[in-house]
Amino acid sequence: MGAAAEPGAGSTAAEWPKVVAAFANPPAEFRLIQYGTHDGAALPMARMAEAGIGGVMLFMQSHGYLRSDDAWRNLEANIRAARTAGLQVWVGDDTGYPSGMAGGLVVEEHPEAESRCLVAVCREGTGPGPAHLDLPATAERFVHACIYPLVDGRPAFDRGRPATVSGQRIESEGLEGPWRLCGFALQLNREGTQASMTISGFGHNGRYPNLLDATAMATFTGLTHEAYARRLGSLADTIDVFYTNEPNLMTSWFLPGARPGGVVFVPWHEDLPRRFQAEHGYDLLPVLPALFGGDDAVSRLARRHFYETVGTLLAENFPRRITEWGKGQGVRSAGHPLLEESMVHHVAGYGDFFRFVSELDIPACDLPMPDRGQAWNFWMPRFLSSVAQARGRATVAALLDPIINRPVAQLVPPPADVRRFTGMAALCGVNQFATYILWHQYDPAVYRGVNEYVGRLSAVLRGATSAATVAVYYPIESFQAAFVPSASTLQGEAWERVAERGSRQDTMAQALLTHGIDFTWLHGDWIRDGRVEQGHLVAAGGRYSVIVMPEVDVLPLPVARKLAEFEAGGGRILWMATLPTMGDFPDENAAVREMFAGRSVVAPGDVIPALGKVAPPGFAVAVDDLQPGVFMAKFVRDGRRITFLVNDGLEPARATVRTTAGEGLTADVFDPLAGTVTPVQVPGILSVEPCSSLLIVER
């Protein structure tokens, strides 16, 4: 994963007048993308434009998906109408979700590419003698078998020996002492999947392809993206964005209870052993039992390396394929993964979530709209915006979703609620919003006002770079090592352990933003490839003086060395809850432990006092003592420093603004609710309306 330039690099003050003009009257590219329907019906584009909508998300008709000439004609008519109305055109790359199946046509064409997962079947015994295992009735074939001596109840991987696979039976000879015979088989993955949950909603067959399979993914793009090019001709002026919706490895169980027989699925492709060997230097097959459990160091590292290999292969095969194809057509790629908020699912669904998202032109997320007082992970979009900044992507998108994380859907939310959720998401880096709230049930002037508010925020903040000087390590290695799959989603001791770790991490992230401390996530690769300069780490489009390490127990040695260099150069490292105990290979462990031995460790609840006062340098405007419900982030764009204030409360909030320059100054306050730009004297007091925001722009 490459990194972008430093904050503000390439920006010019000459661009700022364009920003001011866009704020006054936001062009369509900054306004809401409105979801269409899945029946192919003609959309009232002129009315939508009158309501201030900036674009449409079009879907090919579900009935007869991709095979109906009438559906193609309807889609073309909607595209022409949208272009005539001056709207953006985004197109969903599948019928509903999860993307990747082309409405089930991929598996129809290539049944061999349907998702098949690895399952384990084992038996234990003691002493010599014949031993065998039979293929489970639900599995198709064995792919590997091995017998291991047990030491303290654990398989000794380095002393295991292959067992003979003969058709549907594994045969072996028992070992001296206790042993475990393990067979690993492929099982078709259809029941209880996310894909099976959407059959009735979108009319597909529920048969999901293996996203690790190159043939499957070439077939997917051939049936979908390439079909649009064949039908519509040049796409550069026809479709702006292809949007992918929750493609994933599909190993999790989505029904109540557990998978029949308690069977546990692990993602698999025949190329994984070769890739694993090439990337990590040892054989995957002898350590296959570790993918299903084990807390010893060998098992944890095997899982770490396995899911990293899976993540690399998945990123190449799905999002990179789509993005590279789009470059040749002049169409950008976008999309939101499944359960973006959960570090557990960053592993379960993607191997390495950041690797997957990094390949998209426009990283995106699903944005819940819960009632006040309900759980709300408002900080979650920072995952996506951190990737965007690292990759130099200007646009970060979010779907305002009025259904998820709610007891009852709210398809016509009050405008203040829409402002509330867009403001908090913009605080965390989102600058393009889509939704399927029922726009036609609003007065056109009211909905136009919603679009203008959203458009003004996006007009100023798209292309801006976070000025955060606090980074939080993205501890994917530790989650990969700890993750053990389960027959029941989010159940079982191992899942609970990693989920609790993720919850503590979320609490820390929430506390940072609540106390006015913005931050950026840093993947280990970005730290490794960064440079240390005057007490700062310059990496992934940012410049950081503090790095928070949240329960990091696995730390690759090259990353550890860069962190040690950063610390020696005057940077601060805050270790939350634990110090690293492992490197990325056994011969790294001692060096990693010694490098940070004796460092202080803070509890999750003590991160804020341990940080103390943290503020990005170079800003002449400061806001102290934020009222409860008021949040702050700082950005840099086109040579301008921007202090962004969001009032999440129901009452007007006062913000005391001072100058760090030692004398008064004049700043411009951009009010996205009123649509005004007002010069103000600093120091002074500003009032932020409920569920609204202000952007204080230094001259």
Question: Predicted regions: what is each one?
Answer:
Residues 48-49, 55:
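An N-terminally biased module of ancient metal coordination in phosphate/nucleic-acid-related enzymes
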Residues 179-195, 202-230, 410, 469-482, ...:
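Catalytic grooves of carbohydrate-active enzymes
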Residues 22, 44-45:
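Short secondary-structure capping/turn segments at boundaries of alpha-helices and beta-strands
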Residues 18-26:
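N-terminal amphipathic alpha-helix/helix-capping segment at the start of soluble metabolic enzymes
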Residues 36, 49-50:
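N-terminal beta-rich core of secreted/periplasmic extracellular enzymes
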Residues 8, 12-15, 28-35, 42-43, ...:
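Carbohydrate-binding surfaces of carbohydrate-active enzymes
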Residues 1-2:
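N-terminal export leaders
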Residues 58-174, 178-218:
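Acidic/aromatic-lined carbohydrate-recognition and catalytic surfaces
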